[in-house]
Each structure stands twice: as structure tokens, then as C-alpha cells.
């Protein structure tokens, strides 16, 4: 028999499959159920991870990968175009109201560009962010409630806050607002950058002020490499431009950086030691080996039932290589039928079970990972 006769092998494989439909249906169901098991498991696990991350982001105050703190304008312009940066966002903190009714609330006044506002959960659901050269401001419903202002575009309000120890009262026109999220640590009153400069001029404060942070340029970034090695990427960006973040006393090239600890990848990179790595690797191998054994046993039973058939084929001259091809074709056909069904059903099962599992966990945002 010609080993290269693949057409004959495929035809024999299909006829063999059609001759044992009931057994093949059981095999397809076994493959599908195994796929359902692992798909649902990973869907739930990834969804819980995403939920933890979302909860952490709200505590941190944003979901950018990391950032560079208290920059001068020159440093900001140097760093923002680094090839490791996918997107950047600018924030300039101006001050905070400290008197009643804000004495028990954390409210920050400052400028944030659209990227930064988005990463800080400050996307207006009504209206928009303030435009340059205006007296506009955008904030959340909690701040408006404390001010006694009904959310309405064009509403005017005054806000008294401290700028580096200097008290100032400023009038604003409401141009947008978003819903207050009690999980987010700070509320924000966003104003144009032109208004930042006007407030600084009025109060006589020059960045970085006496506190070392007022109206400095803070740049948060999303990295092209993702969240796997945030700290290393931030250090490399600084090195590209002759800066470092290790020691303030090493020279005037020090720049402070921050890593968003809300990302589980960032936490793992900082806390990953050999025992943890071995435990994760062992768990992954155990899960993979379990799936392999389940599906292998299904095919082993199927092949065992056909052992007489394969013996007859060998008697008439079929080579071991051809027999392996026949079995591979059958395995591929059964897998192509069972795995897609299992993936679809597993995702649906995982999606239904995820909210139930997350409901038992405190402080986790309900998210279903696709």
C-alpha cells in the first residue's frame, strides 16, 4: 500500500467514523465537556482577576500603567515622545479646598488633559471637559452636592481652595459632570490649563511651590509593552534621557516615578520569587496534564474498541505510519467538532457563574473576561 496515498487514508478515516456514530458522538461530547470545564474555569479566573484590578484602579485613582511625578515643563516635553510610551496624559495639581463643606472630603483642583481625565474616571456623562481660555470647570456630582449646586450646564459657582498655602476664591461655569464613585479616593475639579496659570499668577506661586508639587507637570503613561514590566520600562525611559529615579542625592537628574500597583502583573513582577514561580508553573502543568489525560483516555477507549479493525488493516499491508495518520485524522475530526462547541458553551457557563462567584467576594468589581 502506498504510504503517500493520503486521499485513501482520509476516505478510510471518514468511513470508519461513520461506521461508529454513537461512539463518536460520545467522544465529541467528552471533548466538548472537557473544553467546557477548562473554558469556564479560565473565564471565571480571568474575570476575578479583572474585577480585582478594576477595584484596585479605583483605589489608586486611575488605570494608567505608571507615571513621572513633579516634572518641569522641559522634562515633560523630553519624556513624552519616548518610543516606549504608547500614550501619555498630563495632570497639573493646583490646590485643594479644606474648609467646610470639604473638610471631610478629598477634592483636588487642577488641569487634566482628555487622556488623563479618562484614566482617572473623569469622563463627563453630561457636557464636556473645560476649554482653554474660559472660566469653565468640570467635576463630579458629589462636589456639586457639597456646593449646593444643581447639575446643570452653564451653572455658575465659586470655590475657595488653598494653593501652596495661599487661599483663593475662584468663580467657575459648569461645563460638564460625571457620577460620583465612592470607590474612587479623590474627587476632581478640572479646569483649563490657562486658568491654572491665571490662579498661579494671582496667588504668586511659582511651580513647584514650597510643597514641591504645586502646578508641576505630572505625566501618566500607557506603555507599549503593557503591564508586565512597568517599573523597568519607566527606568529605561528615564535612562534614554539622562535621568534616574534611584537617589535624590545622586544629582539634579532625579525624577520620581510611580507604578500602578492595581495591575496584578505589576504586583507579580515585584513580589515574584522562586517558590511562587514554581507553584504557578506546577499549577499550570497540573491543569494542562489533567486535560490531556481526560482527552487521551477518551481516544484510548475509542482506539481500543477499533483494535480489531486496525489489525485487519495491518494484515492487508497498512503500515504503522498509515495507521497513525488514520487515527490523527479521526482525532482531528472529533476535536474540530467538540472543541468549538465546548469553547462556546464554556464561555456561556463561565459568564453565568462569574457574577455568582464574585458576589461572594468583597470589593471585587463584576467583570466577565472574553
Where are these regions (language model features)?
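Juxtamembrane interface helices immediately C-terminal to a transmembrane segment
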Residues: 13, 17, 36, 40, ...
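Interfacial "coupling" helices/loops that link adjacent transmembrane helices in transporter permeases
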Residues: 290-334
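N-terminal membrane-entry
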Residues: 270-287
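Basic-flanked hydrophobic alpha-helices used for secretion and membrane insertion
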Residues: 46-267
Amino acid at each position: 500500500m502506498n504510504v503517500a496515498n493520503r486521499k485513501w487514508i482520509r476516505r478510510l478515516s471518514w468511513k470508519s467514523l461513520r461506521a461508529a456514530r454513537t461512539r463518536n458522538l460520545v467522544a465529541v461530547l467528552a471533548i466538548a465537556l472537557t473544553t467546557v470545564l477548562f473554558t469556564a474555569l479560565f473565564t471565571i479566573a480571568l474575570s476575578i482577576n479583572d474585577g480585582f484590578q478594576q477595584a484596585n484602579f479605583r483605589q489608586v485613582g486611575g488605570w494608567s500603567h505608571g507615571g513621572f511625578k513633579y516634572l518641569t515643563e522641559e522634562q515633560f516635553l523630553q519624556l513624552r515622545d519616548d518610543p516606549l510610551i504608547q500614550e501619555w496624559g498630563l495632570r497639573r495639581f493646583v490646590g485643594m479646598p479644606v474648609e467646610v463643606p470639604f473638610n471631610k472630603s478629598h477634592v483636588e483642583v487642577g488641569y487634566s488633559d482628555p487622556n488623563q481625565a479618562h484614566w482617572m474616571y473623569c469622563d463627563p456623562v453630561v457636557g464636556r471637559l473645560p476649554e482653554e481660555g474660559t472660566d469653565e470647570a468640570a467635576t463630579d456630582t458629589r462636589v456639586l452636592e457639597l456646593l449646593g449646586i444643581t447639575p446643570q450646564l452653564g451653572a455658575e459657582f465659586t470655590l475657595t481652595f488653598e494653593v501652596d498655602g495661599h487661599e483663593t476664591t475662584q468663580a467657575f461655569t459648569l461645563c460638564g459632570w460625571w457620577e460620583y464613585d465612592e470607590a474612587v479616593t479623590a474627587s476632581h475639579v478640572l479646569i483649563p490649563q490657562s486658568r491654572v496659570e491665571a490662579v498661579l499668577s494671582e496667588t504668586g506661586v511659582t511651580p513647584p511651590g514650597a510643597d514641591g508639587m504645586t502646578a508641576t507637570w505630572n505625566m501618566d503613561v500607557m506603555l507599549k509593552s503593557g503591564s508586565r514590566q512597568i517599573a523597568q520600562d519607566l527606568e529605561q525611559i528615564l535612562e534614554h534621557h539622562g535621568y534616574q529615579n534611584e537617589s535624590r542625592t545622586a544629582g539634579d537628574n532625579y525624577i520620581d516615578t510611580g507604578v500602578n500597583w492595581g495591575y496584578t502583573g505589576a504586583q507579580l513582577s515585584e513580589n515574584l520569587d522562586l517558590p511562587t514561580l514554581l507553584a504557578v508553573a506546577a499549577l499550570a502543568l497540573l491543569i494542562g496534564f489533567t486535560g490531556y489525560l481526560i482527552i487521551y483516555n477518551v481516544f484510548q477507549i475509542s482506539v481500543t474498541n477499533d483494535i480489531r479493525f486496525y489489525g485487519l488493516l495491518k494484515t492487508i499491508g497498512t503500515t504503522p505510519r498509515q495507521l497513525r495518520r488514520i487515527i490523527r485524522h479521526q482525532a482531528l475530526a472529533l476535536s474540530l467538532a467538540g472543541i468549538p462547541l465546548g469553547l462556546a458553551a464554556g464561555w456561556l457557563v463561565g459568564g453565568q457563574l462569574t457574577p455568582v462567584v464574585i458576589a461572594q467576594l468583597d470589593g471585587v468589581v463584576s467583570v466577565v473576561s472574553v
